[in-house]
């Protein structure tokens, strides 16, 4: 049986209306066990200022972003279940959901799925990688009972 341990950190000022720990756990459980049996993941919910600082420091982008993924790399020869950290910016997630006319819960779920796949080594730098990652995201989101998060983009193509 797989086990995903969640460390949820609420580092944003307003906690009202945030998904609860059980929801974050369900979303992680919908992704990670497909790829590995045991994992520990920290999800830190932050405000725009912290997201902006981290995005600038680690990605050179001078703005807040929806989700940042920081995979943990154990020293050679040491097996650890620590997968890494997801930093999710509440304001950006809420703004994107509204702009994209997506249910807020579904967008939160998508950010956890997307970030978790990054922790597992997936990326979207080139078109082939993006297609593979988006296909996995869609499959996982549908399996959890949500719509395809890329449906609007597919309709306009």
From Swiss-Prot:
Q: What class of enzyme is it?
A: hydrolase
> What keywords tag this UniProt record?
Cytoplasm, Endonuclease, Hydrolase, Metal-binding, Nuclease, Ribosome biogenesis, rRNA processing, Zinc
The primary site where this protein sits is cytoplasm
CC cofactor note: Binds 1 zinc ion.
Q: Which GO terms describe its cellular component?
A: cytoplasm
Q: Which Pfam families match?
A: YbeY (PF02130)
Question: What is a biological process (GO) this protein takes part in?
Answer: rRNA processing
The EC number(s) this enzyme carries: 3.1.-.-
Q: Where in the cell is it found?
A: Cytoplasm
InterPro entries referenced in this protein's UniProt entry, alphabetically: MetalPrtase_cat_dom_sf_prd, YbeY, YbeY_CS
Under the heading SUPFAM superfamilies, the entry gives: Metalloproteases ('zincins'), catalytic domain (SSF55486)
Q: Which GO terms describe its molecular function?
A: metalloendopeptidase activity; RNA endonuclease activity; zinc ion binding
**Per the entry, which co-factors are needed?**
Zn(2+)
> Which family does the UniProt entry place this protein in?
Belongs to the endoribonuclease YbeY family.
Task: State the protein's purpose.
Answer: Single strand-specific metallo-endoribonuclease involved in late-stage 70S ribosome quality control and in maturation of the 3' terminus of the 16S rRNA.
Q: What is this protein called?
A: Endoribonuclease YbeY
Report the source organism: Salmonella paratyphi A (strain AKU_12601)
The beginning of the lineage is: Bacteria, Pseudomonadati, Pseudomonadota, Gammaproteobacteria, Enterobacterales
């Amino acid at each position: 049986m797989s086990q995903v341990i969640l460390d949820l950190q609420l580092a944003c000022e307003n906690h009202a209306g945030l998904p609860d720990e059980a929801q974050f756990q369900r979303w992680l459980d919908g992704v990670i066990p497909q790829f590995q049996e045991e994992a520990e993941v920290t999800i830190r919910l932050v405000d725009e200022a912290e997201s902006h600082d981290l995005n600038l420091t680690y990605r050179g982008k001078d703005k807040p972003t929806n989700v940042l993924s920081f995979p943990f790399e154990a020293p050679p020869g040491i097996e650890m279940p620590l997968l890494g950290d997801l930093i999710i910016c509440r304001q950006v997630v809420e703004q994107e959901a509204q702009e994209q006319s997506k249910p807020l819960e579904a967008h939160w779920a998508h950010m956890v799925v997307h970030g978790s796949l990054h922790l597992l080594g997936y990326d979207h730098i080139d078109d082939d990688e993006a297609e593979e990652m988006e296909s996995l995201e869609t499959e996982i989101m549908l399996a959890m009972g949500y719509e395809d998060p890329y449906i609007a983009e597919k309709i306009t193509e």
